[in-house]
Every structure is written in C-alpha cells, then in structure tokens.
Amino acid sequence: MALRRPMVAGNWKMNGSAQLAQELFNKFATKLQDDSVEVVLCPPSIYLESVRQLLDENKETLNGCLVRMGTQNLSQHDFGAYTGEISGQMLKDSGCRYVIIGHSERRRMYGETSNIVAEKFAAAQKHGLTPILCVGESGPAREARRTFEVIAEELDVVIEKNGTMAFDNAIIAYEPLWAVGTGKSATPEQAQEVHAFIRKRLSEVSPFIGENIRILYGGSVTPSNAADLFAQPDVDGGLIGGVSLNATEFLSLCTIAMSA
C-alpha cells in the first residue's frame, strides 16, 4: 500500500486578511512538529505576497514542516488581453506551488465547463504548478444515483485532453456540491465510496497513479467530523473552506490529519 502524505488545503475563497495569515503562522510554530502532513494555504491573490513573506520569515520556526502556498484559480491563457486574469507563470513567480482547478463555485457561478477546467489543468502543469482538481456531484445527481457517472465524466475530460500520466503530478478533491458551504457533510462511508471509485478508475489506466494519487475530501469538514473522514483508507486529507478562516480550528484539522 502506498504511503500518501495527508494534505490539508485551506481555500479562503473571497475571505481572509493579512492578519489571518499571521495568526496561522503563529500557530504553525507550536502545532506542527514535523512533515507528516502537508498544509496548503490558498488565499485570495491579493494576499499571496503576505503569505510568501511569512513563509520566508518563518523558515526556522517551521523547522521542516511542510507549509505551502496555493491559489484558487488561474487563466487557461499564458498572456494577452484578458482583463482581471492571472496566468500560471505569474502565479509560479509569486511562489505558488498549487492551484485549485474546477471548484464547484467556479463551475456554477462563472460558467466554467469541463473543457475549460481541462485547459486550466494543462496550463497549471505547463508552468510547474500542481493542480488540485475538484470533482463532485449535485444533490439531484446523487438522488438519481448518478454520482459515479458525473465524476467519471469530469475526470475523463481532463484525461482526454492531458493524458492519464498528467495525474502523476496532481491532487484530486472530491467535493459533493450538496455539502459545499451547507454545513451538511458526506458521511465517512459516502466519502470513502466515492474516493475508492476515483482511485479505481485511475488505476484502470495506470495502477501506479491510482495507488499514489492523493484524493482530498471537501465539503463542510470540521474538527468534529474530520477524524472519521480522514481515517478512511482512500481519503488523504481535506480541501477546507469555512474552517480555514479560523486559525484554531484549521490547525485542529492539521493535527487530526497528522495522526490519521
């Protein structure tokens, strides 16, 4: 069985502040003892420089702990007249290692199709960023028992454009739309069932990738349910929304992941 290092990624969405970043780093020094968990902060782009400075200033106090910087979106284009967009190269230059791709809010609110998501996935990897690819079904799709069908379709578009081996440098986040921001989380059994399906589907085309890719769960993860979720054999951590804005609770999730 592969040894997959747990990851806890905080998606601040359009929230947070430079003060929140400082509060998190103050707690990292006391709560994170080693590299057994990888922590990723994904603030709004305006705060990337603040987080980067804190990473530089706290190298010694972090003492080998894996705290990385990510972002919430990128353009599928390298450059050009795309007002308000940020390219993969710009994000790489800012110090980002990860980028969230295909979050349900981007798909729903901004009309990002699976083809656009696949293009953004490719753009991220072209510029040395690791995509965190979000997939997940709506409430009606789950009720119609179409969960696996929806997720397979979302994965297949990315595979068709980028090839299976592109997942050798990628993270997948299962975020059921009916659990994102609703306070209603998937049960550990529901999460495990879908994570196992994702791993099996990738294993069919590449056993190595299927075994080694990290699959996060996202959707109303809290300190009260994280231990049971993270204990599932195919759940490798979480993509965290609201709780990532509370330094104490977010660090609780990190420590839970360390012992999962």
Swiss-Prot record:
CDD domains hit by this protein: TIM
Swiss-Prot/TrEMBL GO biological process terms: gluconeogenesis; glyceraldehyde-3-phosphate biosynthetic process; glycerol catabolic process; glycolytic process
Residue spans crossing the bilayer: none
Sites where the protein binds substrate: N11, W12, K13, G181, S220, G241, G242
GO molecular function: triose-phosphate isomerase activity
Record keyword Nucleotide-binding present: no
Gene3D superfamilies reported in the protein's UniProt record: Aldolase class I (3.20.20.70)
Pathway as given in its UniProt record: Carbohydrate biosynthesis; gluconeogenesis; Carbohydrate degradation; glycolysis; D-glyceraldehyde 3-phosphate from glycerone phosphate: step 1/1
Localization per record: Cytoplasm
Chain coiled-coil ranges: none
Catalytic activity, reaction form: D-glyceraldehyde 3-phosphate = dihydroxyacetone phosphate
Family per similarity comment: Belongs to the triosephosphate isomerase family.
Function (record text): Involved in the gluconeogenesis. Catalyzes stereospecifically the conversion of dihydroxyacetone phosphate (DHAP) to D-glyceraldehyde-3-phosphate (G3P).
Xref: NCBIfam families: tim
Protein name listed in UniProt: Triosephosphate isomerase
Name of the gene: tpiA
